[in-house]
Amino acid sequence: MSKKATIIAVVNQKGGTGKTTTTENLGVGLALEGKKVLLVDTDPQASLTVSLGNPCPDDLSPTLSDLMGKIMMENPITPDEGILHHPEGVDLVPSNIELSGMEVALVNAMSRETILRQYLDTVKQNYDYILLDCMPSLGMPVSYTHLRAHETSLH
């Protein structure tokens, strides 16, 4: 039987409400309890990526944008591709400003709501929890994140 990670999206339409801090602290807390945790930075501002010790997110590769692009092009990805390991016991899929361009590409993509789901399906067997740090919006990107966070959304 394959393991099914609990997926939690941390969302709010406003910026500066503590989404990133909540995502990071919840993730580290779960890791301290012995859980395998993946944090996914779905915000082009990359606050979670920076907060976890990556001060130049534009220099990172691959990022969430790159991984989603590969899925859109139907190129294979491996379950550990693009994942950074943090000393506090959490893993991170980083983001950067390129994710803004991915939002534009998703507008015209077939089955755009499945792109993030396809990525998460690739990695979920390796984790107990996957936490999604969402951008401040109720537009398309957040609604697609909600589609994937079938377990819980924190507002």
Where are these predicted regions, by residue range?
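P-loop NTP-binding core
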Residues: M1-L154
